[in-house]
């Protein structure tokens, strides 16, 4: 009987360890808050993408205050930012989504910007 109890306890401990380890890993398609180097890389992507947007027919925005950055693996990477953007004359609270598919030579980056108080959404791909 003690052997059965010991095996049950050992099994529960193993299941707990596996569940804890799985919770720490990013699930493909799952959304996760970005921290550390991942957050730093995502912020660099935001700045570079906003700069690229300004070289075309898009507006010229600068990220002032980023309050949240999430990442998701979906046929590439989708980063979502809650950010205050400044266009030189006005500051707006916005949601910015940047979807990158680096293996595509053309149309591998898409940016969508939706700001509070605005009716439309900016949507550009290059």
From Swiss-Prot:
One of its GO terms (biological process) is sexual reproduction. One of its GO terms (molecular function) is cysteine-type endopeptidase inhibitor activity. GO terms for cellular component: extracellular space. A motif (Secondary area of contact) lies at residues 72-76. Keywords: Disulfide bond, Protease inhibitor, Thiol protease inhibitor. Belongs to the cystatin family. This is Cystatin-like protein. It comes from Drosophila melanogaster (Fruit fly).
């Amino acid at each position: 009987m003690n052997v059965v109890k010991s095996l049950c306890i050992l099994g529960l401990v193993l299941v707990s360890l596996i569940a804890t380890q799985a919770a720490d890993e990013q699930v493909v398609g799952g959304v996760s808050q970005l921290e550390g180097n991942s957050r730093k890389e995502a912020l660099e992507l935001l700045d570079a993408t906003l700069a690229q947007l300004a070289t075309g027919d898009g507006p010229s925005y600068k990220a002032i205050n980023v309050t949240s950055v999430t990442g998701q693996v979906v046929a590439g990477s989708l980063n979502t930012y809650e950010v205050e953007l400044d266009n030189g004359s006005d500051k707006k609270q916005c949601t910015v989504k940047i979807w990158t598919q680096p293996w595509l030579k053309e149309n591998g980056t898409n940016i969508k910007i939706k700001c509070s108080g605005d009716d439309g959404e900016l949507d550009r791909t290059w």
